Amino acid sequence: MLGWTLVFLVVAVIAGLLGFTGIAGAAAGIAKIIFFVFIVLLVISLLVNAFRGKSPRL
C-alpha cells in the first residue's frame, strides 16, 4: 500500500510541474496517445485471457 502511495505522489508532482510550467498542452497530447496505447493493451490482454480460459484476477 505504501508503494502505491509513493507512485501516486510522484505522478502528482510530475503533473503539477507540467501544469504550472505552461507545457500542459504538449503533455496532454502525449497523455492522449499513451491513454489509447494502454486501452489497446488492455483489450489485447483481455482477449488473450479469454482465449486461454482464465478468469481475471482481482
Curated annotation (Swiss-Prot):
Origin: domain of life: Bacteria
Family: Belongs to the UPF0391 family.
Protein's UniProt keywords contain Translocase: no
Originating organism: Shewanella baltica (strain OS195)
GO cellular component: plasma membrane
Protein topology in the membrane: Multi-pass membrane protein
Pfam families: DUF1328 (PF07043)
Protein name (Swiss-Prot/TrEMBL): UPF0391 membrane protein Sbal195_1447
Lineage, top ranks: Bacteria, Pseudomonadati, Pseudomonadota, Gammaproteobacteria, Alteromonadales
InterPro entries on file: DUF1328
Keyword Transmembrane helix tagged: yes
Keywords: Cell membrane, Membrane, Transmembrane, Transmembrane helix
Subcellular location: Cell membrane
TM helices/strands, residue ranges: 6-26, 28-48
